[in-house]
């Protein structure tokens, strides 16, 4: 069993990492919980896309590699401030 949010693909452990839209577009760091129970921070390059991957050597099971696959952090509800900001982004063509 690969664990929650993880699956095996061609012998490599893949873990999905939920990343906020603003971090995908602008870059930044996100906290990642590793299979070992430890956590670390992943640097996300600006203009990243859902489905992009980063490999962490020796971070998987039995010191194997771990691929971190970016997924978009989907909000269940937006605040009025978030809606306002998104509307402004739409108005400038983003």
Residue locations for each model-derived region?
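Intrinsically disordered, low-complexity linker/assembly segments
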Residues: 1-94
């Amino acid at each position: 069993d690969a664990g929650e949010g993880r699956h095996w693909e061609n012998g490599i452990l893949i873990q999905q990492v939920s990343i906020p839209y603003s971090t995908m577009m602008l870059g930044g760091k996100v906290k990642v919980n590793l299979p070992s129970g430890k956590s670390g921070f992943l640097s996300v390059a600006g203009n990243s896309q859902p489905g992009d991957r980063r490999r962490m050597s020796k971070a998987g099971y039995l010191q194997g590699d771990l691929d971190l696959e970016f997924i978009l952090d989907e909000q269940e509800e937006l605040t009025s401030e978030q809606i306002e900001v998104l509307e402004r982004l739409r108005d400038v063509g983003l």
